[in-house]
Amino acid sequence: MKKIIAILMAAAMLFALVACGTEPVVTDEPTEEATEATEQATEAVEEVKVMSYDEFVAAELQSEVVVETYVQAKQSWWEKDGVGVATFYTQNEDGAYFLYEMPCSKDDFDNKLTAGAKIRVTGFKAEWAGEVEIIDAKYELLEGNYVAEAIDLTDKLGTDELASYQNRFAAFKGMTVEKVEYKNGEPGDDIYVTFGYNGASYDFCVEAYLTGADTEVYKAVGALTAGDVVDVEGFAYWYEGINTHITKVTPVDEK
């Protein structure tokens, strides 16, 4: 009897030792489901939230903004602190964005950031003298093309509603020239033009960095005299009020 008990106890101890020495097998290989979930999470993190125009308008000043827009026109390219920059007038179907001194290569400026080119812009919303703009901007070229037609804002002159069209490509019809003067008093720099409409005066500008002295519009505006009536096209820039950057003037024949 004692022998049987001893044998049983030895067997039990052997079983316990075997059990204690056995460890579960752990694999380092992730399952297909786990890999797919990780990839989806990474894509979600990398996905950029692009703002609508209304969201851009509602954004706080100095906050980061991301918009998709189309180049409409551009001022001269130059180097600032060794970095190439240019200022762009851009617009999509819902509104316009003024990109101030956005860094870009000369090659991109000449060959890619052309009228109609679609870009995604990341920068910071800022304001200067009433002009809302995007500064410290970076861009990504996208597929797509859009060139805006001038929207007639003549009936918006003198209204608070005009500001909601800021920076858009616009037309103002039947404007009477009151005064034309050159910045610094001589041709080559900006031209300041005061127009009258419905008893009020509005200061527009030929921006030399946009349309220089060798352009048709610069010469045409320089030849205007007080009393001339013209239709005007340009970008509804803002400087303490509407200060359209003129791109075209067309004389209105008196009847």
Predicted features along the sequence, with ranges:
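C-terminal motif of bacterial Sec signal peptides marking the signal peptidase cleavage site
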Residues: 16-19
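Intrinsically disordered, low-complexity serine/threonine-rich repeat tracts
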Residues: 27-46
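Positively charged n-region of N-terminal signal peptides that target proteins for export
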Residues: 1-8
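Hydrophobic/aromatic hotspots within intrinsically disordered, low-complexity regions
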Residues: 25-26, 157
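Repetitive helical segments and hydrophobic/amphipathic motifs
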Residues: 11-12
